[in-house]
Amino acid sequence: MRLSPSFLSLALVIFVGEVVARNVVARASNPASVTGTRKVSLLKNVAGLPAVPTAQQVAVSSLNTDDIQGDILVGMHKQQQRFYFFTINDAATFKTHLAADIAPVVASVTQLSSVSTQPLVALNIAFSQTGLNALGVTDNVGDALFTAGQASNTVGNLKETTDNWVAQFKTPGIHGVILLASDDKSLIDQQEASIQSTFGAAISKVYSLDGAIRPGAEAGHEMFGFLDGIAQPAISGLGTPLPGQLVVDEGVIIVGGTNDPIARPADGWMTGGSFLAFRQLEQLVPEFNKYLLDNAPAVDGKSLQDRADLLGARMVGRWKSGAPIDLTPLADDPALGADPQRNNNFDFTHANFSITTDQTHCPFSAHIRKTRPRADLVAPANSIIRSGIPYGSEVSAAEAAANATTNERGLAFVSYQSQLNKGFQFLQNTWANNPGFIFGKNVQPGQDPIIGQNSGAIRSVVGLDPANPTGALSMGQFVVSRGGEYFFSPPISALTGKLAA
């Protein structure tokens, strides 16, 4: 357990806990928290995904997990979550409650690693640049994208306009975000009420978004239906990596960690924190499904639905089960998808096939290849830990019949990294949006067919038809950005130190 105090995001992540009936809820001695005895984990391990770090792994870790906010390293294991975006009206009062009432109940990585230490409400908090300014913290944090804010240059940085953005994300009025996570929404409601009561008029809620794990067999799958979060990197010094899992230095994710090359404030208050990129990404599921049916490749002996599923798998790079098409190109293998010892153990190379021309296994343009190119380009510095969650209702029968979205749904995307221009921003703009990436191939791959942006114009994607690997498909946008912001999730110690001073 290494790392010094500092750098926690304005994402106040509150993991609320398991169902009330399965936990004992008590009156909180701290007015900002919901307390009680937890009997089951507030997190969910899904078959096929890297597991939550165990207490044993955390105990022998070289990271200072007592000071790192839990959401940073927990990943995509939450069951219910609320993102509570706020503005600070009275900095002095806010600082008092931040240090006295919020900091003591912020959940660390250490706490979340064991049911016995998990709170009913696990609380994290993160701040935008305008939020730090409101608190009088004017240090150069070493990240120009964070300082400018996400809305400042979306056309140049992300290849999108703010036309579809939620109004609150278009202005710099969001000072921070509180994340509340649980499997019981009523506990989240209680926690939000407690926080609002504690801060009173010192803060105002600007916007909120609720997310939830999908029901039944879809648990762990995003709204298009694909198992999500398989390729999370492993942090050196924390646990044992799975076969094929990329191992990155702590400083790729944690500010001030090993091999974080950026100069930070000399007093070290940021060490142990991480930059949080939040994105509200609407997914047009009925339209996506209709596109797959309309453009299904011709494959002998397969039904239309099977061929549509094949196209979807080639766009993503995995079947819905999580099985990588690089290992099973023409048919899903659910057992492979559910096996973390096998489902990430590939690198796009195959004997007797050239990596510069072979798209029979996996297209160069596939989402998982564009965003983690493996043998195409080994780039551990361009890694993120994702900690998002689906939001919105399941597709209704009426929407499916009309092939049109009427109720918004999608992904509340969260990534953590020590540098936004090497993490989220790099993956989105330099890789996913860039039609020339992956470089050095015999064809130009086109944009990432899932998240790639093209400034609102039609996208051209190559290699999706296994029988015509140089052919292109044209497509609109199935993932529509509704906005977001960049935050800093500070170390827990900074909440009673630098940020409360």
From Swiss-Prot:
The active site is at 228 (proton acceptor). Keywords: Glycoprotein, Heme, Iron, Metal-binding, Oxidoreductase, Peroxidase, Secreted, Signal. It is found in: Secreted. Coiled coil: none annotated. Residues 1-21 form the signal peptide. Its EC number is 1.11.1.19, 1.11.1.7. Its cofactor is heme b. Optimum pH is 4.5 with 2,6-dimethoxyphenol as substrate. Retains more than 50% of its activity after 4 hours at pH 2.5. Heme binds at residue 367. Glycans are attached at residues 352, 403. It is an enzyme of class 1 (oxidoreductase). Residues 22-60 form a propeptide. PROSITE patterns: DYP_PEROXIDASE. One of its GO terms (molecular function) is heme binding. Binds 1 heme b (iron(II)-protoporphyrin IX) group non-covalently. Thermostable. Retains 50%-90% of its activity after heating for 2 hours at 60 degrees Celsius, while no decrease in activity is observed within the same time at 30 or 40 degrees Celsius. It catalyses: Reactive Blue 5 + 2 H2O2 = 2,2'-disulfonyl azobenzene + 3-[(4-amino-6-chloro-1,3,5-triazin-2-yl)amino]benzenesulfonate + phthalate + 2 H2O + 2 H(+); 2 a phenolic donor + H2O2 = 2 a phenolic radical donor + 2 H2O. Its main location: secreted. GO terms for cellular component: cytosol; extracellular region. Belongs to the DyP-type peroxidase family. Manganese-independent peroxidase that is able to convert a large number of compounds, but its physiological substrate is not known. In addition to classic peroxidase substrates (e.g. 2,6-dimethoxyphenol), oxidizes dyes such as Reactive Blue 5 and Reactive Black 5. This is Dye-decolorizing peroxidase. It comes from Exidia glandulosa. The gene is dyp1.
